Amino acid sequence: MAIIILVTPEDKVPWAMGLYQASMVMGLVFGPLMGGLAADLLGYRAPFIMFSALTGLCMLGIYLFMPNLQFEHKVDARESQLSLIKSFLVIPRVRLLVGLLFLCNFGITGIGPILPLYIKHYMHMNDEFVATIVGIIIFGAGLFSALASISIGKITERLTMPCIVFTATWAVGTLFILQYIMPSIWGLGIFRAIAGFFMGFITPIANTLISKAVPIERRGIVFGAVSSVAMMGNVLGPVLSGMIARAFGYGAVFWSTAAIFFVAALFIYRSLVIPSES
């Protein structure tokens, strides 16, 4: 991500972050799909060979086509990594946006483990079709998320980034509630896809705002830490969602996630939207 920020002109950063996020989401969507097809057609060892070859091609492409990039602005070699991380965590805007990235990944992955069980227990679906329906729902959410990420460049020309990220965060919270109250599987799937669309705005814009809030020479270490926090959201999302579902029921996962997004939206409004309008 730091390389993308380095080679992209400042006015094109939102577009670049959107394209990066779209490619990540589509990889997460199509990876299991292609792996499953390869396993069914060629055997369970085939996906390992196929993705090893793909990784090798990526490495070869980087070696052959990636230019030797050098940061013009370098940090003092005497500064430790910990001190560099602390230097950006003291910035309130950066803390808020990093927390938002964690929350977004938490919301995306947290619902995944309980979704098949929720559909099976509350929507009385045949066990034979639950896995297929969940796959379709996840694919739809990922596809709409990628479409939103790609369109960020044009949308930021009309609306401010704080306004977009506030609207998207509030909309995601509302859509989690709508997913819970839907009586049919198709209603759940539609609102899950719309929630994926709004989630597609959050990560690229948050990354863009972070890049604008820190000095150029510190963007590399900042985005390294940001990636770590985002991955923690991927890890803790399923764990905490499972604990909530066990203690309070499957519906509590939807309500708790929605509540967290609403709280995040209020912080965004106070810390980003109001200062940008004044």
Per-region residue spans from a language model:
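Intracellular juxtamembrane helix-capping segments at the cytosolic ends
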Residues: 1-8, 201-214
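Pair of pore-lining "gating" transmembrane helices in MFS-fold secondary transporters
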Residues: 91-110, 193
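Cytoplasmic helix-loop-helix junction between adjacent transmembrane helices
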Residues: 1-24
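Helix-to-loop junctions at the C-terminal end of transmembrane segments
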Residues: 148-160
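Short amphipathic helix-loop junctions that connect adjacent transmembrane helices
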Residues: 114-131
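C-terminal membrane-cytosol helix-exit motif in multi-pass small-molecule transporters
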Residues: 54-72, 267-272
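Juxtamembrane intracellular "pre-TM" segments in multi-pass secondary transporters
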Residues: 68-98
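Structural signature of the two symmetry-related core transmembrane helices
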Residues: 52, 163-177
